[in-house]
Amino acid sequence: MDRSQKAESVAFLNGVFAEAGAVVITRNLGMTVAQSTALRTKIREAGATYKVAKNSLAKLAVAGTDYEGLVDLFTGPTAIAASADPVAAAKAVVEFAKTTDKIEIVGGAMGSQVLNEAGVRALASMPSLDELRGTLIGLIQAPATKIAQLTTAPAAKLARVFGAYAKEAA
């Protein structure tokens, strides 16, 4: 890797760290190509990115971002999973880790808060941003629906009463 490629890699990783809502650091221990491809596919489907990077370049890229606390985690064969949704990357990595023992969750971070493996697993158990939005919209719509039902119910009852009087009179 020449100097320009290294600079390009650092710039790319810096962009990933700048846009990420959460970052998960993993250690791949003898994964097959098929497993690695499956992991990358699962992470991509979750809307996250997954990058195997040289530790020295990752340490340079993380400097000046909220994720500077991750510097100590970049030892050994590490990979970086990052997503704008704070839960997506963690959820994808934890779900994949359940299927194989070839991947180790080293830790992660959400903003400047550094997480250990248990913290990443706890983050993965939380609902995603889309799930929270759906729940919130459901909660907001429920009172409006009830109000609409209440405002139309008296009018419908009144119409039935008038209809009954009209039938009696006829």
From Swiss-Prot:
Assigned keywords, A-Z: Ribonucleoprotein, Ribosomal protein, RNA-binding, rRNA-binding
Q: InterPro entries, per this entry?
A: Ribosomal_uL10, Ribosomal_uL10-like_sf, Ribosomal_uL10_bac, Ribosomal_uL10_bac_type, Ribosomal_uL10_CS_bac
Which GO cellular component terms, listed alphabetically, does the Swiss-Prot or TrEMBL entry include? large ribosomal subunit
Coiled-coil segments on the chain, per record: none
Keyword Ribosomal protein attached:
yes
Subunit-level organization = Part of the ribosomal stalk of the 50S ribosomal subunit. The N-terminus interacts with L11 and the large rRNA to form the base of the stalk. The C-terminus forms an elongated spine to which L12 dimers bind in a sequential fashion forming a multimeric L10(L12)X complex.
Similarity-based family: Belongs to the universal ribosomal protein uL10 family.
Biological role:
Forms part of the ribosomal stalk, playing a central role in the interaction of the ribosome with GTP-bound translation factors.
Q: What is this protein called?
A: Large ribosomal subunit protein uL10
The beginning of the lineage is:
Bacteria, Pseudomonadati, Pseudomonadota, Alphaproteobacteria, Sphingomonadales
